[in-house]
Amino acid sequence: MKMKKYTKTHEWVSIEDKVATVGITNHAQEQLGDVVYVDLPEVGREVKKGEVVASIESVKAAADVYAPLSGKIVEVNEKLDTEPELINKDPEGEGWLFKMEISDEGELEDLLDEQAYQEFCAQE
């Protein structure tokens, strides 16, 4: 079963089996503006929840991307090397950043559902 969750640091997480696909939310890309460069994590890297795993540079700012869960990076979106603008065009689809194998499914409970995330954004 596939489920989509969000973090307070503006990452989205689509979970299927024990693999999570991660990207930044539409709200985050709107704040950043036009993305010009993405620094992605290495495949095989073990990451802990909350650790900086990637960074995104735009014409306005640079932003860190945090691991929403603990686990191992199993794939990165190599299209972003030549087409970083995919993050602006389709942040929650073609503009995904990386996939990770989840090591602690208990951490899923800390993630927000879509309604809770929208409410969080409205309060910022």
UniProtKB/Swiss-Prot annotation:
Parts of the chain that traverse the membrane: none
For biological process, the GO terms are: glycine decarboxylation via glycine cleavage system
Q: List keywords of the entry alphabetically.
A: Lipoyl
Q: Which residues form the signal peptide?
A: none
Q: Which GO terms describe its cellular component?
A: cytosol; glycine cleavage complex
Cofactor binding note? Binds 1 lipoyl cofactor covalently.
Q: Which residues form a coiled coil?
A: none
Tell me which residues make up the Lipoyl-binding domain.
Answer: 19-101
Needed cofactors: (R)-lipoate
Q: Which residues are annotated with the PTM N6-lipoyllysine?
A: 60
Pfam families named among the record's database cross-references: GCV_H
Q: Which domain of life is it from?
A: Bacteria
What family is this protein classified in?
Belongs to the GcvH family.
Query: What role is this protein assigned?
Result: The glycine cleavage system catalyzes the degradation of glycine. The H protein shuttles the methylamine group of glycine from the P protein to the T protein.
**Oligomeric form and interacting partners:** The glycine cleavage system is composed of four proteins: P, T, L and H.
Annotated HAMAP family: GcvH
Question: What protein name does the entry list?
Answer: Glycine cleavage system H protein
- Report the source organism: Thermotoga maritima (strain ATCC 43589 / DSM 3109 / JCM 10099 / NBRC 100826 / MSB8)
In the UniProt record, the gene name given for this protein reads gcvH
